[in-house]
Swiss-Prot record:
It comes from the Bacteria. This is Uncharacterized protein aq_1220. It is an enzyme of class 2 (transferase). It is a multi-pass membrane protein. One of its GO terms (biological process) is response to iron(III) ion. Its EC number is 2.-.-.-. The keyword Nucleotide-binding does not apply. It is found in: Cell membrane. It comes from Aquifex aeolicus (strain VF5). InterPro entries: Glyco_trans_39/83 (IPR003342), LipidA_mod_glycosyltrf_83 (IPR050297).
Length: 499
């Protein structure tokens, strides 16, 4: 079985780590973690993140610490920025494998669970990108895995390890790091073993999580009271009811895209598990249902919010695929998903005129048919699509992102960081990282002497360099790619020295 697992693990490792450090820091979100972690290493202040000279308390410090560790090992660069996020992504897949094997007793279901999670589009995208989402999902999954092991094996120390993992989730993304695993455990026990909830250790454990993670929130409240309260209420309270209002069914639709390549099959699997009353799947069913319903009720909805439910979704889907039920429905769905992925890869290659680079992937796409492993069709299609994306499309995109060059030129003009540096007309969030300084923005007056990077027409000066730079968010990646092709939202920026 270990050989089979390695055969599955190796291509996943390729997808997660190949060209990982090739692309410059993405805008806007990745820039916050890149620059703040860099500042932590420079200043030695690891409790209060500082981005572009300003305190940033939107998220607790765990993600910044993870990036800082990467910088320590690999240097302050893009590989260091993303390495441990990719590694935690793989580890989340391994935990899903172990949990699926424990729950179902099937090695094939466990392998499929690992594949389904690891190849999920939004999951792998976030694993190759520095943000709190994958570390948060990892710690939630670790907490629930350890608790389930405690509950089934009755080993006390696993219970307390589960609480430590939950504390780390809180230090990654706030109170949800405790609320989500605690809610899953509570409702599962309510269904299966309500007397377990009477044990005092669950309430002592709640206090333990509060002590292990609450110290950072208390520290920020005491030191930066106003800034902390404003951000804490916005991030943890207003998102529930005030910031934006998305429809209740948002995630029911979003799963069809975000959980590709096995997305449609999940709904069949969910229906099958409930109809057949698959008792062994009660834990992942409660896990998915609780997270899905909680975030469906929350007014502000973002696809990554339900990513902590993905391991449970992967296990449910894998067990369905490994069963003998609804074979015709499964096979038709698998072929349909494979076809969608093949057509998407082909469309991408033709649109960007890279069709020749697609030929080596054709045998890979057809391999499941020869092996008669139809459950692997979406996995092979996803591998081809994602490998094509990381080996061809991402390097192509990088030629339209000269941020390293812009930062290098600014450092060359002012190596000692003695001049004020401005950006006018737009703010590129990764510029503080590459220029290695505070970038002044939203100003009505430029104080001389200074370096100014200005959108053409926003400031009159004699440029020493010019670049075409993108003037929108890169987080909607396929929109960004279309803008590159159509040459939209790119503007000329002038770099000037004002004396």
């Amino acid at each position: 079985m270990m050989k089979k697992f390695l055969l599955v693990l190796i291509p996943v490792l390729i997808l997660y780590f190949y060209n990982l450090g090739y692309n410059a820091v993405w805008m806007p979100n990745e820039s916050f973690y890149a620059d703040s972690a860099k500042n932590m290493l420079k200043s030695g202040e690891f409790l209060t993140p500082v981005y572009n000279g300003e305190i940033r308390l939107n998220k607790p410090p765990m993600t910044y610490w993870i990036v800082s560790l990467g910088y320590k090992i690999f240097g302050v660069n893009e590989l260091g920025l993303r390495f441990f996020h990719a590694l935690l992504g793989v580890f989340t897949g391994v935990l899903t494998y172990l949990l699926a094997r424990r729950i179902t007793g099937s090695k094939n279901t466990a392998l499929l669970s690992f594949l389904i999670l690891s190849l999920s589009f939004i999951f792998i995208a976030n694993a190759r990108y520095a943000s709190p989402e994958v570390p948060f999902t990892f710690f939630i999954t670790l907490s629930l895995y350890l608790w389930y092991e405690y509950f089934t094996r009755k080993k006390e120390f696993l219970f307390w390890l589960a609480l430590i993992a939950s504390s780390l989730a809180v230090l990654t993304k706030g109170p949800a790091g405790f609320v989500l695993p605690a809610g899953v455990v509570f409702f599962y026990l309510l269904l299966r073993a309500p007397k377990e909830l009477l044990k005092i250790k669950y309430y002592a454990g709640t206090l333990m999580v509060f002590l292990l993670s609450g110290w950072w929130f208390l520290y920020q409240y005491l030191v930066h009271r106003e800034e902390f309260l404003e951000v804490f209420i916005k991030e943890n309270v207003k998102r529930i009811y005030a910031l934006q209002r998305d429809p209740f069914y948002f995630y029911a639709l979003d799963i069809n895209v975000s959980f590709l390549p096995y997305s449609f099959l999940f709904f069949f699997a969910l229906f099958w598990a409930l109809k057949e009353k698959r008792r062994e799947l009660s834990f992942p069913l409660v896990w998915f249902s609780f997270i899905f319903l909680i975030f469906s009720i929350v007014k502000m909805k973002i696809p990554v919010y339900i990513m902590p439910a993905y391991p449970a979704m992967a296990i449910i889907t894998a067990d369905f695929l490994n069963s003998q039920s609804l074979k015709k429905v499964k096979n038709l769905s698998l072929i349909f998903l494979w076809t969608v992925l093949v057509l998407a890869t082909l469309a991408l290659s033709l649109y960007f005129k890279f069709s020749a680079t697609l030929f080596p992937l054709i045998p890979l796409l057809l391999l499941p048919f020869f092996l008669k492993k139809y459950e692997l069709l979406p996995a092979f299609g996803a591998f081809a699509f994602l490998f094509y994306l990381s080996s061809v499309i991402l390097p192509y995109v990088e030629q339209f992102r000269p941020y390293r060059e812009v930062g290098k030129e600014i450092r060359k003009l002012d190596p000692k960081n003695e001049l004020r540096t401005y950006e006018l007309g737009f703010f590129h969030h990764n510029l503080p990282f590459y220029a290695d300084r505070v970038i002044i923005r939203r100003t009505k007056e430029v104080k001389k002497p200074a370096i100014v990077l200005a959108r053409k027409g926003s400031f009159d000066c004699e440029p020493v360099r010019k670049w075409e730079l993108y003037t929108s968010s890169e987080s909607r990646f396929f929109k960004f790619m279309l803008d590159i092709k159509r040459k939209k939202r790119f503007e000329e920026f002038l770099l000037c020295v004002i004396k």
